[in-house]
């Protein structure tokens, strides 16, 4: 590489001088080494000895005067660049000349690059400044260098800064947003407060209205409870619905519930229930004394009922639930005091289990454990005024699980049908009133008296005595049938006047006294004590219900058979099939008819039919059936008034049949509709109602 500078000749001369000096120094070194005993290059190859760092004047390449960047490791320890060493080894060195560039390349490849790089790095770090002038061109390069011209500064361009918002604008906007949010929250809070206030005012107003309504209801309940309080005393599951419980404005077709019972009748029912609630374990003396104390006012109150006040409770009374009246009713003693307003206000609550929709399943299940037929534990007794008070017998039927007639129908009926149902109801009431109770205690002998009572007879003597009294009353009615034919045309309507009742009562009393005297002379089958009791019973007053029963029996007899046979001894006793059928329902018990006055035969009309009860014990006692003479049935009525009444009663019978047929039709339709979907009242205890017999 040629040196760059102003004088090329001077540089070449300097380079030649340097090479010569180096060659001489190299030879001197070899000689010194030979003297020391080291093997020469001629005899053996010399070992490569790395010298120390070169001096500053020797740090450059003799060929190009540059710092060797890539030093070639020569055997003579000369420092040369790789380019100079490859072209020609130092000409002044004997070791370098024969080897030449080929050896240098092999040496550099074999010795590795580590030592060469170490030496080059040492040279660059050791003396960089003295080598720079020679590298740049020798002495000429060491002169002052021209300073570089400064770069021109770029021209300043002013640009207007972009303003996103004015100072304080964002904070003002945030403040507005916070203010709006606060106003909205305050408005919602005010709305909520207003709503709560309105709700509170509405609730207070509702409470005030409820209190006012409650006060008005309490006044109404107080007024109604004073009139019908005894009718609300029943909450038993199977207790018979009283007339007070049936007061509703809706008048159904088959179960009419309009009722207007008097307070006296309800009080009598209450006292009667209190009597029934006595325990069966009480002694006979205690029961007789208690009934003697309570029965007279009750009997007097019961007899005040007129046909006009008798309500139409319903035709299907057998479907209503009945409670066993012989079981003690413990709720009556608890509810007797009605002094406080709270007890009166509690009366308007609905009954617990009267409705079939009741959810009281416990009381419904208790019906399975109640007896089907219950007999009272108290025997019939004689009242101080001479009347005989007999207990009731409760007869009920098993359940019918396939249908239910408890619910009332929702359709109306015509006034004509309602009138016919009223007549049917009256007939049922008559039959229940005249039914005889079955005694459960031991019957004493004839003439034996219970302590605390006048005279109580056995159950076998009582039916005969009761029948004689009823028969005498029927005779009186048959005698006065002619004069009162115009008054009886409207019978059995509810609008019967009290004048007719008074007339019937007077006639029945007079004839009862006559019957008493005749029974004292002609009675053959009864003892002296029995005759005295018959006389006392015949002289006692009869209630209006029994009188109406006899009248209905007489008129129905005239209508069906158009015969009015008269008996010479009894003075015109009606003895037709209809009369005997009704009297048989009076429950003579042993299947015979006994006449206490003249022992006249009364037709039985049971020829060829099965007897309802056995009469073997009666035949053993000497009592036999008596058949009527055929001559009594050949008489024909001659009174046109009675014939007219008979025709009317026959028409009423046809209307009753029509009402029953319509009821069956409606009932069949209702069962058809409810057959697919079951009803909740399919398991009800169906029993006959005894509302009219109380």
From Swiss-Prot:
Top-level taxon of the source organism: Eukaryota
Cross-link annotation Glycyl lysine isopeptide (Lys-Gly) (interchain with G-Cter in SUMO2), location: 273, 349, 498
Subcellular compartments: Chromosome; Nucleus, Nucleoplasm
Sequence positions bearing Phosphoserine: 12, 234, 236, 326, 390, 396, 472, 630, 679
Quaternary structure and interacting proteins, as annotated: Interacts with DYRK1B.
Similarity comment text for this entry: Belongs to the RNF169 family.
Name of the protein this chain belongs to: E3 ubiquitin-protein ligase RNF169
């Amino acid at each position: 590489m040629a040196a760059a500078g102003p004088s090329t000749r001077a540089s070449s001369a300097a380079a030649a001088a340097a090479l010569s000096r180096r060659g001489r120094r190299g030879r001197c070194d070899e000689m010194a080494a030979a003297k020391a005993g080291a093997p020469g290059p001629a005899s053996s190859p010399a070992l490569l000895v790395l010298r120390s760092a070169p001096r500053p004047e020797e740090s450059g390449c003799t060929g190009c005067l540059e710092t060797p960047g890539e030093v070639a490791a020569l055997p003579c320890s000369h420092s040369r660049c790789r380019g100079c060493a490859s072209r020609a080894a130092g000409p002044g060195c004997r070791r370098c000349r024969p080897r030449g560039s080929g050896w240098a390349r092999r040496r550099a490849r074999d010795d590795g690059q580590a030592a060469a790089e170490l030496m080059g790095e040492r040279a660059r770090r050791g003396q960089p400044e003295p080598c720079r002038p020679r590298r740049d061109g020798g002495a000429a390069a060491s002169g002052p260098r021209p300073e570089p011209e400064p770069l021109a500064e770029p021209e300043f361009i002013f640009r207007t800064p972009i303003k996103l918002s004015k100072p304080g604008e964002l904070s003002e906007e945030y403040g507005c947003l916070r203010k709006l949010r606060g106003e909205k929250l305050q408005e919602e809070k005010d709305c909520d407060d207003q709503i709560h206030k309105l709700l509170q005012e509405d609730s207070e107003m509702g409470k005030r209205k409820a209190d006012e309504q409650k006060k008005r209801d309490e006044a109404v309940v107080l007024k109604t409870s004073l009139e019908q309080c005894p009718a609300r005393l029943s909450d038993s599951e199977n207790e018979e619905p009283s007339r007070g419980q049936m007061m509703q404005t809706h008048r159904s077709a088959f179960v009419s519930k309009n009722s207007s019972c008097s307070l006296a009748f309800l009080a009598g029912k209450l006292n009667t229930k209190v009597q029934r609630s006595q325990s069966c374990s009480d002694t006979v003396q205690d029961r007789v004394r208690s009934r003697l104390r309570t029965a007279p006012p009750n009997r007097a109150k019961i007899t005040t009922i007129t046909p006009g006040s008798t309500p139409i409770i319903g035709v299907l009374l057998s479907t209503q639930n009945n409670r066993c009246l012989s079981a003690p009713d413990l709720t009556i003693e608890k509810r007797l005091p009605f002094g406080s307003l709270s007890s009166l206000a509690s009366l308007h609550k609905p009954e617990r289990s009267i409705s079939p929709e009741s959810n009281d399943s416990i009381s419904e299940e208790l019906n399975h454990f109640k007896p089907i037929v219950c007999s009272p534990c108290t025997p019939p007794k004689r009242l101080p005024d001479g009347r005989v008070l007999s207990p009731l017998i409760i007869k009920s039927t098993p359940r019918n699980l396939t249908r239910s007639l408890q619910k009332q129908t929702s359709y109306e009926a015509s006034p004509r049908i309602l009138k016919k149902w009223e007549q049917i109801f009256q007939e049922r009431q008559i039959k229940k009133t005249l039914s005889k109770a079955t005694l459960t205690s031991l019957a004493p002998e004839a003439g034996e008296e219970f302590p605390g009572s006048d005279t109580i007879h056995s159950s076998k003597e009582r039916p005969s005595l009761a029948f004689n009294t009823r028969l005498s009353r029927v005779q009186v009615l048959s005698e006065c049938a002619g004069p009162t034919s115009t008054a009886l045309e409207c019978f059995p309507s509810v609008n019967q006047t009290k004048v007719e009742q008074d007339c019937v009562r007077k006639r029945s009393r007079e004839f009862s006294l006559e019957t008493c005297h005749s029974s004292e002379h002609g009675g053959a089958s009864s003892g002296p004590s029995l005759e005295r009791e018959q006389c006392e019973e015949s002289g006692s007053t009869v209630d209006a219900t029994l009188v109406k029963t006899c009248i209905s029996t007489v008129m129905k007899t005239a209508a069906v058979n158009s015969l009015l046979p008269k008996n010479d001894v009894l003075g015109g006793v009606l003895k037709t099939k209809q009369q005997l059928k009704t009297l048989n329902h009076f429950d003579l018990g042993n299947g015979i008819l006994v006449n206490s006055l003249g022992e006249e035969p009364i037709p039985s009309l049971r020829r060829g039919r099965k007897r309802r009860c056995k009469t073997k014990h009666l035949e053993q006692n000497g009592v036999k059936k008596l058949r009527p003479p055929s001559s009594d049935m050949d008489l024909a009525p001659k009174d046109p008034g009675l014939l007219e009444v008979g025709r009317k009663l026959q028409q009423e019978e046809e209307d009753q049949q029509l009402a029953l047929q319509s009821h069956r039709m409606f009932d069949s339709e209702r069962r058809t509709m409810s057959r697919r979907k079951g009803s909740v009242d399919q398991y009800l205890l169906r029993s006959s109602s005894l509302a009219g017999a109380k």
